[in-house]
Amino acid sequence: MIIGIVAGIVIGAALTYATGLAKLFLAPYGSSAEYKGSESATAPDLATGEWINSEPLKLADLRGRVVLIDFWTFGCYNCRNTLPIVKSWNDRYRPRGLTIIGVHSPEFDDERKVENLRREITSLGIRYPVVTDNDYQIWNAYKVEAWPTVFLLDKQGRIRWMHVGEGDYKEAERLIQKLLAEEPPLENK
């Protein structure tokens, strides 16, 4: 009986560990979820960090705009692969009502230094707002588990789509266009 209990505990722990590893290693290949109607939740606000390329932003002040939140870190290979696409969306859709916010949640100590982040933002040609998240407050509020992770918020500030890893760019762009075409909330008309 004791052997059965111990075996059950060991198997359960192994499955939990394997699930965590799968999330970690499958993230580069991408996984997405679209939220509709009552499934969508209001996005947590962005905790205070140091803002680059912008004054501090609050999501409530962005109601009426579609918001893309990109969790990244400059040492992440997959994040660097997604940057050209994210930057092109900023150029293409910002005039139509899209706001992109980068949330820089560092993995390594040198990524925590704001001067290093500023240098990388300049080098990478990022022109949209970036907020530092050295203490992972925003990361934890959004329950992020891997870099890069992208959230799309509708004009009411609700999470309508999220994607982990690279890829699914056509679906993301389709949803950006769909959300931009939706009517803004009544209080913003």
Go through the PLM ranges and name each one.
Residues 57-80, 86, 100:
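Short active-site neighborhood of thiol/selenol oxidoreductases, capturing the structured segment around
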Residues 120-128, 132-177:
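Thiol/disulfide oxidoreductase modules built on the thioredoxin-like
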Residues 44, 77-78, 84-88, 129, ...:
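Proline-centered helix-kink/hinge sites
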Residues 63-67, 95-99, 125-129, 155-158:
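Loop/turn elements at helix/coil->beta-strand transitions in domains of secreted/extracellular proteins
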